[in-house]
Design a protein with these regions (language model features):
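Metal-dependent nuclease catalytic cores that hydrolyze phosphodiester bonds in DNA/RNA
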Residues: 1-41, 155-156
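Short, solvent-exposed loop/turn segments that connect beta-strands within catalytic domains
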Residues: 32-35, 50-55, 98-101
Length: 192
């Protein structure tokens, strides 16, 4: 833990992103459309959000495997793990509680394993907007489920689910290779 703290503290931008604020403050509010109660718990809420200052940048700390820390891999992780949804949800909670949306959102990404590299990424505003739209749909669906007391699963009726394309290709290729070997034997190596 000390090594990770040292790595974060050694990164000037990360250090500033985690200064002057409140860690893990719980925000709770009632959705204006559905009346459903919502909550969020940002990793770090800057004092500037609480005080209503002009610059309000929220920080979300992510500890990830190194395979998710490069810009390209983090882009995929934003989708896989819904980080853009969290940014949208936290932003909405901050607006509801403090009256203004954050002016920015930054992910401080730390590799779980040594050397514990630290990277800072921010989602473009249009991705946070996408997250807001999805959150709106999710809240509306949740409210409808509450009202009806019906909680549908992924497939309430029989549904065909097949192998993904990559698995089909792998199986088909290995089956063809195995069949060829069974009929013709191992291929002979060409003479040099």
């Amino acid at each position: 833990v000390e090594k990770i703290a040292d790595r974060i503290g050694g990164n000037e931008a990360a250090r500033h992103a985690l200064m002057r604020g409140v860690p893990e403050m719980t925000l709770a509010w009632q959705d204006e459309v559905t009346g459903v109660w919502l909550r969020a718990r940002p990793d770090f809420l800057p004092q500037s959000c609480i005080d209503g200052e002009d610059i309000r940048i929220v920080t979300d700390l992510k500890f990830l495997a190194g395979t998710h820390c490069s810009p390209r891999k983090f882009s995929k992780a934003m989708d896989d793990f819904g980080f853009y949804l969290a940014a949208a949800h936290y932003s909405e909670g901050i607006k509801q509680i403090f009256g203004k949306y954050p002016t920015g959102f930054v992910f401080v990404v730390v590799e779980k394993d040594e050397p514990h590299t630290v990277s800072l990424y921010y989602p473009p505003p249009e991705d946070i907007d996408r997250g807001r739209k999805q959150m709106r749909q999710a809240i509306d669906l949740f409210a409808a489920c509450l009202k009806r007391n019906e909680w549908p699963g992924y497939a309430d009726r029989p549904m065909e689910v097949g192998l993904p394309i990559y698995a089909r290709m792998r199986v088909d290729e290995s089956t063809e290779t195995d069949l060829t070997r069974a009929i013709w034997g191992e291929p002979e190596e060409e003479a040099a």
